[in-house]
Amino acid sequence: MRTISYLISFLLLAACTGTPSKAPLTLWYDKPAQNWDEALPIGNGRAGAMVFGGVEKEQLQLNENTLYSGEPSVVFKDVKITPEMFDKVVGLMKAGKYKTASDLVCKNWLGRLHQYYQPFGDLHIQNNKPGDAAGYKRALNISDAVATTVYKQNGVKYEREVFASHPDNVIVMHLKSDTPNGIDISLDFTSPHPTAQQKGTDDRLILHGQAPGYVERRTFEQIEQWGDQYKHPELYDANGKRKFDKRMLYGDEIGGKGMFFEAQLKPVFPKDGKCEITDAGIHIYNTDEVYFILSMATSFNGFDKSPSRDGIDPSAKAASILEKALSYDYQTLKQRHTEDYRSLFDRVDFELFSSPEQKAMPTDKRLEQFAGNADPDLAALLFQFGRYLMISGSRPGGQPLNLQGIWNKDTIPAWNCGYTININTEMNYWPAELTNLSECQEPLFRMIRELSVSGAETARNMYNRRGWVAHHNTSIWRESLPNDNVPNASLSQNTNNPAVYLSLN
């Protein structure tokens, strides 16, 4: 085992040559994504999208890494361990009565699940010129962080490029046909949040909404079986009776709490073209080239401030981001994006060699054959794909990578799409130093500093101790109490010394 560790370390260090790879590193496929898991991720460390690469209907599923349910006042803090209770649990454990100790801990020491990372919405692009596609290819070039879709339809060649720019904080989509007036498309937003509304203006399409003020993924039956109704005053009255028949509350259902969000989408014609914008969406026609600039913003204003009462105006922020990006043409936007991205990505070159036949295969076919056929170059590609995801998902000023990076389609995602800080968060950042991406750790270090603030309150109120403490899970609201109903996980503590481990591993 130690020999394997040495070999892995040698390979990682040998990869850091500082010379960029000669050939583009590309994941590619010969058909559109059939579901979210097959779509291609792009991101700029704050905004992200999953690109499906459709022909008749294209879809970009959108995320912004501050969009969460809840707010600071929704954080459950009513847990206090008395010295007598502490001594009793320790005594039971010393006596080997682990089940009794566990039951006591579940009843008195644990909080509840933290709040949830939320999807922003979807951008849909309808092709109004139907026809069978030929020569189809969609790809993600991780050498320059650009997703492309190319195909022919009715004898016309279409090319689509999408990227998420870190320097300009926008997502850019460029469409081109090789025939005059070849493009006829309609675009609109949707969102899983019932509060979201679409509005057209003279020059742009806007999506505005509010995330849920409270979400709970545990079922009513689980909560009641555990006797945890008192931990959920949003759902239960003082007598433990249900106030709602649902576990996701919006707006007036939760006293107006919840984070506001807004997206603004503007089309730009490098040459001629026609555009109609209404509340129903955007219609683009009579052109062979158009690009779109998409900005996204939320009312998040810090882990300790209410986004509904003390939040940033997402409309003003999204408009400001968009106006700055509009000062550049498409080629300049793309150049600024690729130069910024490659300043990080090109620090490492890692080449393993496979046959030309293997390299010519679509990536999904290569993965299918990998188990029984040596394909070293695919391993090198996946190594670089990991670095791509780090750069795309974690940049200074943003939030750390959560359990799904920055990409999530579900309002109640698996494990809350949170930060599991007893191991998974650390694992996300293990490659950062070894693969020469030190800057990408800044969001993690800032989260630790913020946890020390909420963690000092938990140390004082829960344990009657100085210093600070965090347990096994947190979110953008920097919860530091033990949460949920699983004591062997919930009580995984990250006090000051383990926080050094969290920082350095």
Locations of the language-model features?
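Sec-dependent signal peptide recognition
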Residues: 2-9
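C-terminal motif of bacterial Sec signal peptides marking the signal peptidase cleavage site
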Residues: 14-15
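Aromatic-residue-lined binding/catalytic grooves and analogous aromatic/hydrophobic interfacial grooves
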Residues: 18-490, 504
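Active-site neighborhood of glycoside hydrolase catalytic domains
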Residues: 494-505
